[in-house]
């Protein structure tokens, strides 16, 4: 789905399909869609991976170049180990600090992170199963904005009152955010399981001494 198709979907849900008398412009709906895409990205970001060089003797990495970064899930260093050697890390602004493992020696590391989803004229990175969810959030924002504008005006046209639009929009946003919270919890559990630090069981046959 591209942006034009998403706008059409949102218009359909809003019953705003009379091209001679649109209640919302394409620009307005695009703004609401982008807001919904941003919120989806916070709960369920686009999985991404980057290869960055470390600096010998330093545990700090500049991650400002990670495009549209929403979060960092894991840091693998050194790369190529089996199982993967994930390290503990901390982030302050655009600076990531590797907190565990051997001192970096200038070799590469892998950064697994979540990025903002893309929805533009060319296409989308949003999974098909979440397109209706994004449309629902955009509808909620559009309805609330229109209701806030029209609620104190008399002749706004249409058969639905501004108050009804406000209630409908608030319910759409409530359902949208509730589903985002559910998806966010599930995604955190998945990330925790996928990128857990490798801690092999202690040997029962080797004596490590007192």
Q: For each predicted feature, which ranges?
A:
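Glycine-enriched, solvent-exposed interface loops adjoining structured elements
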Residues: 1-210
């Amino acid at each position: 789905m591209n942006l034009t198709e998403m706008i059409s979907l949102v218009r359909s849900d809003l019953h705003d399909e009379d091209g001679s008398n649109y209640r919302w412009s394409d620009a307005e709906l695009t703004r609401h869609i982008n807001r919904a895409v941003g919120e989806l990205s916070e709960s369920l970001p686009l999985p991404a991976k980057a290869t960055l060089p470390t600096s010998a003797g330093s545990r700090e990495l500049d991650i400002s170049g990670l495009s549209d970064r929403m979060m960092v899930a894991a840091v693998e260093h050194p790369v190529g180990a089996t199982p993967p050697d994930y390290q503990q890390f901390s982030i302050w602004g655009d600076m990531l600090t590797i907190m565990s493992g051997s001192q970096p020696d200038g070799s590469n590391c892998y950064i697994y992170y979540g990025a903002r989803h893309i929805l533009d004229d060319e296409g989308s990175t949003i999974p098909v199963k979440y397109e209706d969810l994004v449309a629902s959030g955009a509808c909620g924002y559009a309805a609330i904005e229109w209701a806030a504008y029209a609620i104190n005006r008399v002749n706004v046209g249409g058969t639905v009152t501004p108050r009804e639009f406000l209630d409908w929009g608030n319910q759409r946003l409530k359902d949208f955010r509730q589903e985002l919270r559910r998806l966010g919890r599930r995604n955190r559990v998945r990330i925790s399981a996928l990128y857990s630090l490798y801690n092999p069981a202690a040997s029962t046959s080797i004596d490590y001494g007192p």
